[in-house]
Amino acid sequence: MMKTRTNLIVALFALCFTGTVSDAYAWGWHKRKSVKNDSVVTSESKYDELVKKAKTREGMFRIHQVEKDWYFEIDDSLMNRDLLIVNKVSGVPYQLNDAGLNKGMAYEDKLIRFHKDTVLNKVWVTTWNPRVSVPEGDAIALSVKDNYREAVIEQFPIEAFKSDSSAVLIKVNKVFDGSEKSFNDLYNSISLGASVKKELSRIGGMKAFPQNIVVKAFLTTQITEGTESVPLTVETTTNIVLLPKVPMTPRF
């Protein structure tokens, strides 16, 4: 009788323990599943929420404007593609016009590529020198690649993913409003060596086309001539052009 009672107690204890483990496992699985689903929903909702309240321009990149903030929506198909930045003067004050700087003058060109990094949740921007190239499969191709690497000039946090993950949203204000010089280094390029006053500068507008993006900006600085400080505001146009997948034949 005592042995039977002991066996019954052991069996009941084992049953309770098994039930507890099963409940804990199930709770943990549902918790992980819930977190995963919440994460996806949050990401999708952020994209949908942002696009819903934005003024959108269709083109090479979709441009979304939310009040004073500007976003590029970059498709995966455009990651790692060759792009050319062309910066031109669109309007100058008297002092610079008198010194020979006129509307229409180009002052900075740059080749860039966008690279999506889902591990660090960033989009990197690199530049390189096109004068150094080698045919793919050539015996020295690897050596050339190692000795003439692309340089990173900018990074953008990924603000949101498109629901099917085929595109990302990045906020691009900083490279056009004078905060950073990576896309538009106006005053160094025209040999003034001055810094942009961000609080007195702004993005004038953006337009999207099938093969390019156009950005207008008003960049202000202040230079000192003798005892006099002179404020200067220059209107610039930045054109980001999609280059052919097969590089064009060089002239030389």
Residue ranges and their predicted role:
Residues 27-252:
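Auxiliary tRNA-acceptor-end handling modules of aminoacyl-tRNA synthetases
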Residues 1-10:
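Bacterial N-terminal signal peptides that target proteins for export
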Residues 10-19:
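Bacterial N-terminal signal peptides
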Residues 20-26:
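Sec/Tat signal peptide C-region and signal peptidase I cleavage site
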Residues 6, 22, 36-37:
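Intrinsic-disorder/low-complexity regions
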